[in-house]
Amino acid sequence: MQYSEDRIDQEPGMVLVVEDDEDIAQLLCYSLRKKSVPVAIAHDGLTAFALVEQLRPALVLLDIMLPRLDGHEVCRLIRSHPDRDLAGTPVVMLSALGAPQDIEKGMELGANAYFAKPYSVKDVVAATMEWLGTGEGNQ
């Protein structure tokens, strides 16, 4: 996992899980809901970006290899959005692309953190809870 220097201090809020693998999406959502985190799911990049604009999530868990629009482009669209609050939405990339250059690209595009698959769902949830400011990281 890699983090950027930009951390946030905000109240817990809704997390948008963007993952085309239904099993992984459901596991992430189940694990977050167990921590009382509201979640929404998108299975492709176009839907994900539309939901970011509509729902204004507190954080986006974003797969990279997605149908219709890849995660890199979704992150680019979020970061270049004219609404500066929306453009600052924390993005945590989740990807099978785990080579150093892949992680570097994700971070350069504006990801706040990057988990390479296979990642521990427990670690992703703990990091999410830290980003949301709940102090429940490893509980």
Locate each region found by the language model.
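Non-catalytic signal-transmission and effector/linker regions of two-component phosphorelay proteins
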Residues: 1-16, 122-139
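Conserved acidic carboxylate
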Residues: 19
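Charged docking surfaces used in two-component/phosphorelay signaling
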Residues: 26-34
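Short hydrophobic/Thr-rich beta-strand motif most characteristic of the beta2 strand and flanking loop
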Residues: 36-43, 51-52
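Active-site beta3 strand of CheY-like receiver
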Residues: 55-61, 66
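Short, glycine/charged-rich "phosphate-handling" switch motifs in NTP-dependent
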Residues: 112
